Regions:
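Short beta-strand/loop motif that positions the catalytic acidic residue
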Residues: 97, 103-105, 109
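Catalytic active-site module of serine/aspartate enzymes centered on a nucleophile-bearing elbow/loop
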Residues: 127-156
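Conserved alpha/beta-hydrolase catalytic His-Asp/Glu region
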Residues: 21, 41-93
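Active-site acidic short loop of glycosyltransferases
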Residues: 4-5, 98-99, 126
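Residue-level signal for the nucleotide or nucleotide-sugar donor/cofactor binding architecture
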Residues: 73, 112, 141
């Protein structure tokens, strides 16, 4: 927002405007309060479908692949991220984003419900919304679909 000339186009994936967002179901949020999923791979495998939706609900190979790649984060860093989500919001200045913006979101995203993508698209001028039939981790579960579409948007 401060230097729009530095950004020709913007792509926002599986995100919200911050604290003013429509939250996921409380049972999902309860699983996110702790960094346990980053520390306990069996726990991650058990909750991945509920937490991330999409292919994580139906494809055990995707769940295993994700659980094996996840890096442990520091508790401090994790809680700072939660704090940022709780107190920071971009809602009041989204209208100042002037460059063409592609908003990509999964229709089955339990963490950040799709209504949040619709809010972003309604508040950002020149925004295009691509609501996909997938979950929160579509960049990992569907890279062969997502990457070319993003490339096409950026090349326009």
């Amino acid at each position: 927002r401060q230097y729009p000339e530095r950004c020709r186009k913007l792509v926002l994936c599986a995100t919200s405007c911050g604290s003013a967002m429509f939250p996921g179901h409380p049972s999902i949020l309860a699983k996110m309060i702790s960094p346990r999923r980053y520390l306990d791979k069996k726990y991650m495998s058990r909750i991945a479908g509920d937490l991330y939706g999409g292919k994580m609900r139906t494809d055990p190979a995707q769940v295993e692949k994700h659980a094996s790649r996840v890096q442990t984060t520091s508790s401090r860093g994790y809680y700072y991220q939660l704090l940022a989500l709780a107190i920071w919001s971009s809602l009041h200045w989204l209208h100042k984003i002037t460059m063409p913006t592609l908003i990509v979101h999964g229709a089955d995203d339990p963490i950040i419900p799709p209504v949040n993508a619709k809010v972003l698209a309604s508040r950002i001028p020149n925004a295009e919304l691509w609501l996909m039939n997938c979950g929160h981790l579509f960049m990992l579960t569907m890279p062969d679909t997502v990457a070319p579409a993003i490339r096409e948007f950026l090349d326009r």
